Amino acid sequence: MASIQYLNATHTLYSCLKHSTPSSHDYSTCFLQQDSLTCSIFVLLCTVAYCFVWSILCNNVSKVDQIWSIIPFVYSWVFFLHYYFLNNEIHYRLLLVTLLITLWGVRLTYNFARRGGYGNFIQHEEDYRWPILRKMMNLPTWLLFNLTFIAGYQNLLLWLIALPANIVSQGGAGWDELGFLDIVLGHIFFFLIVLETVADQQHYDFQEYKYSLTPAERLKSSQKSVREGFFQDKYWKYCRHPNYLAEQSVWLAVYLFSCISTGELWNWSVVGIVLLVLLFQGSMQFSESITLSKYPLYAQYQATVPKLIPRCCCCCDASSNKKEKSE
């Protein structure tokens, strides 16, 4: 039945687009004739094609990185606008979720842009991990990896993490549906955005300062992080990836909005946050292997500082006391 539904949806979309000059009415009719999930799938397929084709034309697979902070809130706005135009009313919980995801996207887009991630659109920086992986594969294997994982799976994941917003759209829409839990979760979401922003800024300031010094000046620096080459102060002395901790928690909060809407702790959209956590685990492991190859003292940092979850103060104190006694 699902396959028939999507075949019908594809036929309707083709009917809307086959005219040389379709009107805005044609587009809106096509949009509302499909359910919001189907509309989002069309966006997903377009982004996969865009990322794969442009990665070949530009010899740069970081097109997914460029839309990473943008496409999730596009999906959320698709869900919100579809509900609004179909029902002629505002879904307030969905609007709240959409605005929060948009806030996340604007912040992350700015952070990516200031690091030169967008360049001049055609020529832009490629994530340092991709060239390393590219050297490990022959061309056919790399192209297959590009299509299935970089352009395919990562875009699928961006779609999946936004799907709790679709679950929210199926729940109560009225202003009176917003309750205490929505307010608490909204504040937690905002706190996580601030946490991630501060952590990113700390690391950005460190990198800017480090690369403003000559290699000789770095070795003579009074700052341990500068001498050893990697940041290990402020938030980064509590865990090795505080920004990633906040990032994953942000999407857990998005999922919890769907739980509030359904009144149940579990729904099928949980697959997005689960797969996101798994992706981050692999990404962190690969990134740290590169860092370790450049900075041997990073192994000591790994041994003493947790990867994601900071140790509580009492655990840290107990560990320090134990270390002092052993010495």
Please place each PLM-identified region on the residue numbering:
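Juxtamembrane helix-capping/reentrant segments at transmembrane boundaries
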Residues: 60-74, 116, 120-148, 229-236
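N-terminal, membrane-interfacial amphipathic/helix-forming hydrophobic leader that caps
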Residues: 45, 52-60, 66
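Voltage-sensing domain
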Residues: 144-154, 159-160
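A broad structural signal for alpha-helix termini and local helix breaks/kinks
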Residues: 57-58, 137, 295, 305
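Hydrophobic transmembrane alpha-helices
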Residues: 2-48, 71-112, 155-202, 207, ...
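Broad structural signal for hydrophobic residues in well-ordered alpha-helices, predominantly aliphatic
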Residues: 53-54, 133, 291, 301
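Residue-level signal for the start and early helices of compact helical domains
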Residues: 55, 121-124, 144, 194, ...
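Intramembrane alpha-helical segments
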Residues: 48-54, 142, 167
